[in-house]
Swiss-Prot record:
Top-tier EC class: transferase
Taxonomic source organism: Rickettsia bellii (strain RML369-C)
Gene Ontology CC annotation, any one: cytoplasm
Protein name: Probable aspartate/prephenate aminotransferase
Entry annotated with the keyword Transferase: yes
GO biological process, one term: biosynthetic process
Coiled coil: none
Assembly behavior: Homodimer.
Biological function: Catalyzes the reversible conversion of aspartate and 2-oxoglutarate to glutamate and oxaloacetate. Can also transaminate prephenate in the presence of glutamate.
Keyword Nucleotide-binding included in the entry's annotation: no
Gene: aatA
Site (Important for prephenate aminotransferase activity): 12
Length: 399
């Protein structure tokens, strides 16, 4: 009898973390690798947030807190939803966890029964399907390629709903594509949901504040307040405030769900880090002006990367409305031979080619559930980004 649970047989290690690990190994070996695989901002946590954390340490705020988060942070989250999204939540409808990932994990563990279906538009964030599988749910994938601007339409959603459907996942702006749902697109989805009262929605808004070209962000509970009790909204401080390592995410939904998720959290991690919670209060309540400036910097990086990569004859590029990724179609290169005679048959092969020939680390599209693409993160310096894109252009030009 194996000591490892059979439930883990269907679960794969994170492919994005695997790319990061491989990149670090090559760098340690002295190879000049430019990594475009990581999904975190390249700026530091603002000083006012750090100072709030230091004060919390000096004040001795280092003990257990409420499992679901300290009142001050839940109040800051409540105010954020009202101020930015025009949504009213009671404090009992809010939970704070150790990152947005734990919020989503707790949500599915609390709500899924064996065989319940979760509709996941592909490409998707790599952890969605595995978290559904761990909760004994069934992922149902909706292929949303570049021809549909990487977004799920109401009409396509209608075709996927069955009596077993329990959740739909919406991630806007999206990882890995940066595609973002407009007001009318969300309204279209809401119209379908009204016909199916047993279908709930998990809205992952973690990239909410990183949008470009004047794009106006909306979240589904804002568009369809009549569906609020069926919508669970996930957010956090990781991306907007560059606090990926602080591990604070939060969610808002029905009191019944929050209560169930709190029970799960109480028997796993207990409360999120007390010091990180104080830092998150300062993030949400403190000055916000730098967020727009950071988004503008990402927009400039997006434009730089596109200006180079659009020249590659094998690539088809989508101009994203947000986040800090490009998800580039590259299937025209399949069948090409490298100088060593190896045939590039899929996105994994192409990722390996770029790593070996261009010394650039990217993430193959198959990791996100859609073959024929690859993802780059442009959350790096302008100089490094330009060099990486030029290397990729040269590497493709030699095929």
């Amino acid at each position: 009898m194996s000591i490892i649970s059979t439930q883990l047989n269907a679960i794969k290690p994170s492919p994005t973390l695997a790319v990061v690990r491989k990149t670090l190994e090559l760098k340690r070996a002295g190879i000049d690798i430019i990594a475009l695989g990581a999904g975190e901002p390249d700026f530091d946590t603002p000083d006012n947030i750090k100072e709030a954390a230091i004060k919390a340490i000096k004040d001795g705020f280092t003990k257990y807190t409420n499992v679901e988060g300290i009142p001050a942070l839940k109040e800051a989250i409540q105010a954020k939803f009202k101020r930015e999204n025009n949504i009213d939540y009671d404090l009992e409808e809010i939970i704070v966890s150790t990152g947005g990932k734990q919020v989503i994990y707790n949500l599915f563990m609390a709500s899924l029964n064996k065989g319940d279906e979760v509709i996941i538009p592909a490409p998707y964030w790599v952890s969605y399907p595995d978290m559904v599988l761990l909760a004994e749910g069934t992922p149902v994938f909706a292929n949303c390629g570049i021809e549909s601007n990487f977004k799920l339409s109401g009409e396509a959603l209608e075709q996927l709903i069955t009596p077993k459907t329990k959740w739909l996942i919406i991630n806007s702006p999206s990882n890995p594509t940066g595609a973002s749902y407009s007001h009318s697109e969300l309204k279209n989805i809401a119209e379908v949901l009204r016909k199916h009262p047993y279908v709930n929605v998990m809205s992952d808004d973690i990239y909410e504040h990183i949008t470009f070209d004047g794009f106006k962000f909306y979240t589904l509970a804002e568009i369809a307040p009549d569906l609020k009790d069926r919508i669970f909204t996930v957010n956090g401080v990781s991306k907007a405030y560059s606090m990926t390592g602080w591990r604070i995410g939060y969610g808002a939904g029905s009191k019944a769900l929050i209560k169930a998720m709190t029970i799960i959290q109480s028997q796993s991690t207990s409360n999120p880090c007390s010091i990180s919670q104080v830092a998150a209060v300062e993030a949400l309540n403190g000055v916000q002006g730098y967020i727009a400036q950071n988004a503008l910097n990402f927009e400039k990086k997006r434009d730089l990367a596109l200006s180079i990569l659009q020249r590659v004859k094998y690539f088809e590029c989508y101009k994203p409305e947000g986040a800090f990724y490009l998800f580039i179609k590259c299937d025209k290169i399949f069948g090409a031979k490298t100088k060593s005679g190896k045939v590039i048959n899929n996105s994994n092969d192409f990722g390996e080619y770029l790593l070996e020939e261009a010394k650039v680390a990217v993430v193959p599209g198959i990791a996100f559930g859609l073959e024929g693409y690859f993802r780059i993160s442009y959350a790096t310096s302008m100089e490094e980004l330009e060099e990486a894109c030029l290397r990729m252009e040269r590497a493709c030009g030699s095929l």
